[in-house]
Each structure stands twice: as structure tokens, then as C-alpha cells.
């Protein structure tokens, strides 16, 4: 249970970051939205 809760918190944070990025570069982000970009975003989020 605790693991799922932790995962949900991380997903919410990633979603919030994605919203901020999309607000400024919606068209660009959509065209470059790949698994690699998501992996980079998660790694940066983890360092913070």
C-alpha cells in the first residue's frame, strides 16, 4: 500500500511539471513527447 501511495505522489508531481511545460510550449511538447523525454523529466525531478 505504501509503495502505491508513493508512486501516486510522484505521478502527481510529474503531471504538475508537465502542465507547466505544456502551458508555454504546448505544440512543441506534444510533437516531442516521447518516453525518453519523460525519463529525463523524472530523473531531474528525482535530483530535486
From Swiss-Prot:
Induction of the gene: Expression is GerE and sigma K-dependent.
Any one GO BP annotation for this protein: sporulation resulting in formation of a cellular spore
Biased composition (Low complexity): 35-48
Segments of skewed composition (Basic and acidic residues): 1-16
Sorted UniProt keywords: Sporulation
Source organism, top-level taxon: Bacteria
Record region (Disordered): 1-48
Full protein name: Small, acid-soluble spore protein G
Taxonomic lineage: Bacteria, Bacillati, Bacillota, Bacilli, Bacillales
Amino acid at each position: 500500500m505504501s509503495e502505491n501511495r508513493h508512486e501516486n505522489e510522484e505521478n502527481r508531481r510529474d503531471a504538475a511539471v508537465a502542465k507547466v511545460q505544456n502551458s508555454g510550449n504546448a505544440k512543441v511538447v506534444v510533437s516531442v513527447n516521447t518516453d525518453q523525454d519523460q525519463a529525463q523529466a523524472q530523473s531531474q525531478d528525482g535530483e530535486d
